[in-house]
């Protein structure tokens, strides 16, 4: 009887997880295809839809631009409880996040501002993962009007 209760709990937990995967050719159409897939999750993503769409677009674009591999790009979007997890994997060699934040574009700075946490795993491939809270963080307290970005990202005169 106890095993039935555990099985029921596992089934309920799986029902609470909404997951989609996509395999993409590493070409200029990949970011648009990734955005199209995320668009199908609009109701599940709630108020974070635009943020997730932007992060997925940035990560897939980076994968297309910076991985020299012709192997497919893999994307995962997983919605579970109060969190959204994104993963974009390619056969590239990876990168050091701290050294990549000041590069040619703003993509990783945007990811850093939206994400609750993010990082890179390398093990024969490169996976950039991002965790986003399902509910947007609201600014509170007396300093909420202040720019909270790290000093290295502030604009001159800001």
Question: Which residues does each PLM region occupy?
Answer:
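A short beta-loop-alpha structural element at the N-terminal edge
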Residues: 25-30
